[in-house]
Structure formats: structure tokens, C-alpha cells
């Protein structure tokens, strides 16, 4: 058994309803997703794998392939289709391909997992500062460098330049093609709005309703092309700031049809939006009612509010942030809707990023 499409399957989740474990069929252990997609030696962040597959919670798991990498613990979720695996990567672990070996009685299958060596100087990377001139752009509206990906078979909203809130076709290739232009303006850093998959049926051009935290929207390009964009931006003397969202995902996120835990997102008997009173996040005299509604209410109906008080959610979010920095060679984050997050877990999230990259700056502005 191999990992289908290296964990980069198309999103299928569209529902908003509460998770009901009884509604999920128990099948025979096919792993469809392992996240993070890969990892590195010498990291400070503990590695906890999210494994998704029909009935996977019934399986034991061990790691083969070399010395210094092994399973520390496994944790079941509310859904039988998830398993969280704590992995130890010792300081002397060798980079290479390891195998997650899943077993249940006589049945056994393996899933490859890559542990790579960190890039030289990764920890000491320089970040953006107040000395930088930052160029903000919206990828879908900037430049269309590849018309073939304007609409794709596995994303719901198709390109329509006549629609004011529709997708217009801008992409990563268009951004790469115009790096000379951006640098020529005197910019020293570039901040694109979110590029991760947004699979909402309409209004997905802005990217703020994430459908997969480990996948660049195919209408913009690919993970590999994003990494190429960052590298070419650096060649032009431009730092790259990734725009990310920790407060919410989108209703089109792949996990929305089968949440790992009932409290993976904040749920209510009926739709409950945030009170948009983000001053409560910093007000020691704020009422608990106002603060809870600010932190737990959904930003809009298409953006389910993540529950960062759930330790598995928080660890998942720490890891995907670190993964993108290391994978793509990023220079900074802009964190959208920061005041809508739970304050204490987000302080832990910030600390995890800065522990891995002490000089890495986080812009917490909210527009």
C-alpha cells in the first residue's frame, strides 16, 4: 500500500454539520494522507503525524528504515479514520526514506516517509524588518502566467473574468514573470495574499478559506512552483512573506466531512458568528461572554473557527507553519485575523516558530 498522491489529494469536504462518529463507515485501513508531508533532522519542533485513512485507528504502527527515528506513542481520535503518531527523531538520525509500518493481525502495509537534512543556515535565516519596502499583491488579480491552470478538474470554482468576485486567472507563474517589475519599483519584500488551496464554490480568489494546509491551490500552481517562486524572489533581492490563517479553515477543507475530534472546530447548535470585538483579546476586564464569542464564533459562514485549545489542533498548526518555512525557505509570516485566535495557544504557536527560527518575524496585523 502506498500513500496516494503523496498526501496531496483533492479536497472533498464541503459540510458544516456536527461530526457524528456513528455515520462513518469502518473500512480496512487505506492510508490516504500523512501530514506533515515530510520532516527534517535537527528540528526543535516535536513531530506528530496526522494519519488519515478508513479504519486506521485500529492499526498498530512502527517505523522502519534506519536508526534514530521511531514511534513514541499513538493516539486515537473521536473518528476511527484518524491516528496521531508521535515520532522521535533523534539528534543522530540519518536523512532518508523511512517507512510507517501499519499492522492489524496478519494484515500489514507500509507508507514511505521522508526525513530530509535541513538546508545550511536554515535556523539563522534573516527576516523582514521595518527597513523593508513590502509589495502586497493578490495573486489571482496580479498576472496570469499559465492559462492552462485557470480552472482545474478537482477544484469547484472555475475562472470567470466577468465575475467581480470570481477567479480571474492570476498565478505563481505570473508572479515569477514579474519579479523584475516588483524589484524595479524598489521593493525589498513581497507579500502575496494566501496561496494555499481555497476550495469554496464562490469567492475563492482571495484564499482566506483554506481547504488544505499543505497544498498550494492548483489554480496558482504547485508546492514545487511556490518554492521556485521563493528562490527566484531571493535572486531578485526580495524577501517572501507568506500570508497564513490560523483562526479558521474553509468549509471546503478536506476534513470537514469527517473531523478528527468533535472539538476540532468550534461548533454551535446553529450558526454563530464572531462579535468582531477583537479588543476583548487584549482587555483584562472583558466579559467572558464577549471574549468567548470573539474567539469561538465563526468569522463568516464559510470559515469554520479552529479550536486551538485542542492540543492536537495546536500541534498540527505549529507543524504546518514550520513545514512551510523549512520547505519553501520563507522569510516571514503575515498572520491573518490574529486577534480572533485563542490568546494562550497562539502565544505557544508564536514561541514554537521563534524557537525553530529565532530571527523569524511574524506580522500580526489585521486588515
Model-derived regions: residue spans:
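Beta-strand/beta-sandwich contexts
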Residues: 17-58, 111-125
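Immunoglobulin-like IPT/TIG beta-sandwich domains and homologous Ig-like subdomains
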Residues: 43-106
